[in-house]
A protein has these predicted regions:
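N-terminal pre-catalytic segment of deacetylase/amide-hydrolase enzymes
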Residues: 2-91, 97-105, 110, 126, ...
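Hydrophobic alpha-helical segments, especially transmembrane helices
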Residues: 8-10, 183, 242
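Metal-dependent polysaccharide deacetylase catalytic core of the NodB/CE4 family, i.e.
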Residues: 85-88, 98-100, 109-239
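Short acidic donor-binding/metal-coordinating loop in glycosyltransferase active sites
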Residues: 92-94, 242-243
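Non-transmembrane alpha-helical segments in soluble domains
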Residues: 105, 167, 229, 252-255
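Catalytic grooves of carbohydrate-active enzymes
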Residues: 233-269
Length: 273
């Protein structure tokens, strides 16, 4: 009696079709290091998410929202550091110059603190000397996109243009390679996180921010100082706006008080230490 082998081999053309099907749902990019990055941004959700946190005043890490935090981390982003280390990562959003950045830079220099400045194309074009000073003092320059548009409202090509045109300008004018990005308005989606990561960028959100951005309605200095100090916590990524007079006037005091409380200020480049 002849035994028939029931095993069926998949023909080579079948394997090829399967591979093509997988790649059809994905996009391959070359990141800044020249490495191929495979993403499935074509099928990712584009539901717009506004970053938010639930603060406390007992110096514990705030609630970032488990779902949003997980989504951010799955796509290489960060919002808060090690809960066991009293580190603070100071960041500034600089869409335009209001006349306070020279004082901010001086306070950082006097207190030996390195910060990250997220800037737009407008800022580079109007304040090249300040950008140069930031770099010379050892601060990090982050990408806040060309035109500060909400990223989920943009298609893939528009996102690449908003991010990489600014990247190219920094390379050409300052020989500087940016690698951190903060989404304008704190708005993002699963799709935009994947697409910015594919461009070689790490998305940086925050674990503390407050209403400091309105120049015409600046917070009271005493209340602002108390709020900032009450919310200090391990691994904090602090977001301040560079157009705030209150922040500028308080910066030196905040740094000194935080150090007295046992906190150390770290650069984003030291995030994993």
């Amino acid at each position: 009696m002849k035994v028939v082998d029931q095993k069926r081999k998949i023909p080579y053309w079948g394997i090829a079709i399967l591979v093509l099907a997988i790649f059809s749902l994905s996009v391959v990019y070359m990141n800044q290091e020249g490495e191929a990055v495979l993403t499935n941004s074509g099928t990712a959700s584009n539901e717009k998410i506004g970053w938010g946190i639930k603060r406390n005043d007992n110096h514990e890490q705030p609630d970032l929202g488990k779902k949003n935090q997980t989504l951010l981390e799955q796509n290489g982003g960060i919002a808060m550091g090690n809960k066991e280390k009293k580190y603070i990562y100071l960041t500034f959003d600089e869409g335009y110059e209001a006349g306070y950045t020279p004082q901010i830079l001086e306070a950082l220099k006097q207190n030996e603190v390195k910060a990250t400045f997220f800037i737009t194309a407008h800022y580079i074009n109007t304040e090249p000397e300040l950008v140069k000073q930031m770099i010379e003092q050892g601060h990090i320059i982050g990408n806040h996109t060309v035109n500060h548009k909400s990223m989920p409202d943009l298609n893939k090509q528009e996102i690449e243009s908003e991010v990489m045109k600014l990247h190219q300008v920094m390379q050409e004018k300052f020989q500087y390679e940016m690698k951190y990005l903060r989404p304008p308005k704190g708005e993002y989606s699963e799709r935009t996180l994947q697409e910015t990561q594919s461009l070689g960028y790490k998305t940086v959100m925050w674990s503390f921010a407050y209403q400091d951005w309105d120049e015409k309605n600046q917070p009271d200095k005493t209340k602002a100082k108390q709020k900032i100090l009450d919310n200090l916590h391990p691994g904090e990524i602090m977001l301040l706006h560079g157009n705030s007079k209150t922040n500028t006037d308080l910066l030196g005091e905040i740094i000194q008080e935080a150090k007295k409380m046992g906190y150390e200020f770290k650069s984003l480049d030291e995030f994993n230490e």
